[in-house]
A protein has these predicted regions:
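A short beta-loop-alpha structural element at the N-terminal edge
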Residues: 2-15
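Helix-loop element at the rim of GNAT/NAT acetyltransferase active sites that forms part
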Residues: 16-33
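Acetyl-CoA-dependent GNAT
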Residues: 28-86, 97-98, 103
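Terminal substrate-recognition subdomain of acyl/acetyltransferases
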Residues: 81, 139, 146-158
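Conserved beta-strand-loop-alpha-helix junction that forms the acyl-donor binding cleft
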Residues: 88, 114-124, 142-146
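Conserved acetyl-CoA-binding loop-helix of GNAT-fold acetyltransferases
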Residues: 89-104, 125-130
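Conserved GNAT acetyl-CoA-binding A-motif
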Residues: 104-117
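Conserved acetyl-CoA-binding loop of GNAT-fold acetyltransferases
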Residues: 129-139
């Protein structure tokens, strides 16, 4: 069973591990730099909310939630999700997205937008669409993969 809750400081090392795994895979996050304990603590503390998915074995997934813009567009937020590779396909991502959607509303955001969903990430796209997110279009070659090739990205919102 998975529980999603707000992160606490002792969670940071496990969060960094999950985050860095996705960064190293190079097919979902735009970030290229890995987090260390200091940069991870600062990064997670700067978010509007970080949620962690916890099982008996520890933290197996996480999300970050923050404003996507400022001023007149400050009611739009953005989020990123990470699930450890050995736990994918077990609906942990869905639990994270649902908790994030609830948190976004509680924080006063009116729109949740994903700027750069890699078109080849079929599992994420199916999940977002099943939860009611709408695809805004496609940006050809908007994401540079680890192998140097460029993949399309699909912005989504709800």
């Amino acid at each position: 069973m998975v529980t999603v809750r707000a992160y606490t400081e002792p969670d940071i090392p496990e969060m960094i591990s999950v985050w860095n795994e996705v960064v190293e895979e190079g097919n979902a996050f735009p970030q290229e730099e890995l987090l260390d304990e200091r940069s991870g603590a600062e990064f997670f503390a700067s978010q509007s909310r970080c949620g962690v998915a916890v099982t008996d074995s520890g933290i197996v997934g996480m999300y970050i939630l923050h404003p996507n813009n400022v001023g007149r567009c400050g009611h739009i937020c953005n989020a990123s999700y990470a699930v450890s590779s050995e736990m994918r396909g077990r609906h942990i991502g869905e639990a994270l997205v649902r908790d994030c959607m609830k948190s976004a509303r509680e924080l006063g955001f009116r729109v949740l937008q994903f700027n750069a969903v890699v078109a080849e990430n079929a599992a994420a796209r199916r999940l977002y669409e099943r939860l009611g997110f709408m695809q805004l279009g496609t940006i050809p070659g908007g994401f540079r993969m680890n192998d140097g090739k460029y993949a399309d990205i699909c912005p989504y919102y709800i």
